[in-house]
C-alpha cells in the first residue's frame, strides 16, 4: 500500500537555471507522493507494471512512460506494483513555469505546446 503522507520535494533547480536533467538507473521504482512548484517531464523505461499516481488517477505503466506535470499542487508518485526488479531507466527534466512565457506560448506554432501544458495540469 502506498504511503499517503504528502511531502514537498525540494528540487536542485536554482532560480538561475533554465532546467535540470536528472538521469537514474534503479532496480525498483518507488517514489512517494509529492508536489513541487517546478514543471516536470519524466521518461521511464523498463518499469512495465509499476503504478503511476497523478492526482486521482492510478494506472499501470507500459514499457516506456512519458509524463508531464505542470501543476504545482498536483500530487504524483510512482510505485512498484506488477513490475519485476530490473534495470529501470529514468530521465527527469525539471524547469520553471516561466521558462516559456505567455508571449511565446501564444504564438501560432506553440498552440499545441500550450494545450499540452494545460492538459498536464489535471
Predicted regions located by residue number:
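Generic protein-terminus/edge-of-domain signal
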Residues: 1-68, 73
